[in-house]
Amino acid sequence: MSKVSQPRFHLAFPVTDLEQARSFYCDVIGCSAGRESDRWIDFDFFGHQLVAHLVDPADHPFAATNAVDGHAVPASHFGVILDWSQHEIFVARLKAAAVEFVIKPYLRFEGRKGEQVTLFVRDPSNNYLEFKAFRDIEMLFDKDIDNY
């Protein structure tokens, strides 16, 4: 039995069409597909395991939003934190694929110690994803919200 050197995150989420999910996560986001059945597909999402489970569209949850920095941020979302330079490359990849941004790439908390770039997209099943990068990754879990 092999040891896992770094814990891996696992997330299972609903999709309404597996082939659309495969196209979005592999061709647009850059994931590779792993195991699959006629009801689910595993994706390697930046080294973490996503599992897209096929559901009836009527059973897919509605996403509520929360106001953050003047934007209606989907309360239910997932994503990854990239290096600053990787984020710029990733934005270019999304633009080249003509992905519609739910929240266009922008600089949040500009000039403050928590400065970050962020964007939101939606997959074909209306699952929301956030991709962001911190100017200083040490601020990821900083508790000083007043000076963030």
Task: Pin down the residues of each PLM region.
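A generic structural signal for short beta-strands and their flanking turns/coil linkers
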Residues: 7, 39, 48, 74-76, ...
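Vicinal oxygen chelate
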Residues: 18-19, 73-125
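A short, acidic/glycine-rich surface segment
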Residues: 59-66, 104, 108-112, 139-140
